[in-house]
């Protein structure tokens, strides 16, 4: 999986703190609001985005009421994400404004509305992976990277 951009420093639970692990950040939990580490922990992440751990820093762990006691300092990036798009937009290297396509097949939901991307995101098409069908139409499955505005 490709990753681009600057690494973000954050904290994750000790059990998740391994390179290659991906997670979706859903927003701060109640205990985070009064935590002195919230700025570096949840303050650097955007709710609803997918992150991939690149590196675990060799620093001491910190106590946390949410993560079974301990969190570790890690470097994360937003990874590339696979999404189905209109074939006319599928040009490798191009930047498009993401417009989700409707698909009634619940098993393909993750391809048509993947977690980590939002309608209207500006994304760069990294690679065209193939075709995917839904509702009698053929779409292109592409790997994209979100472009931060």
Curated annotation (Swiss-Prot):
**Which Pfam family is one of this chain's hits?**
UPF0179
**In terms of domain of life, where is this protein from?**
Archaea
Q: Which InterPro entries match?
A: UPF0179 (IPR005369)
Q: What HAMAP family does the record point to? A: UPF0179 (MF_00498)
User: PANTHER family given for it?
Assistant: UPF0179 PROTEIN MJ1627 (PTHR40699:SF1)
Give the record's family classification.
Belongs to the UPF0179 family.
Name of protein: UPF0179 protein TON_1048
């Amino acid at each position: 999986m490709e990753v681009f951009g600057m690494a973000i420093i954050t904290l994750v639970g000790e059990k998740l703190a391994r390179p290659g692990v991906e997670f979706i950040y859903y927003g701060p939990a109640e205990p985070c609001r009064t935590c002195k580490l919230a700025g570096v922990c949840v303050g650097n992440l955007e709710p609803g985005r997918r992150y991939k751990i690149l590196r675990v820093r060799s620093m001491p762990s910190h106590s946390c009421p949410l993560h079974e006691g301990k969190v570790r300092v890690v470097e994360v990036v937003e990874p590339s994400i696979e999404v189905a798009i209109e074939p006319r937009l599928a040009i490798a290297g191009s930047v498009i404004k993401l417009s989700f396509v409707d698909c009634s097949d619940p098993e393909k939901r993750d391809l048509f509305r993947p977690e980590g991307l939002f309608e209207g995101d500006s994304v760069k098409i990294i690679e065209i992976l193939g075709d995917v069908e839904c509702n009698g139409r053929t779409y292109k499955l592409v790997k994209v990277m979100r472009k931060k505005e």
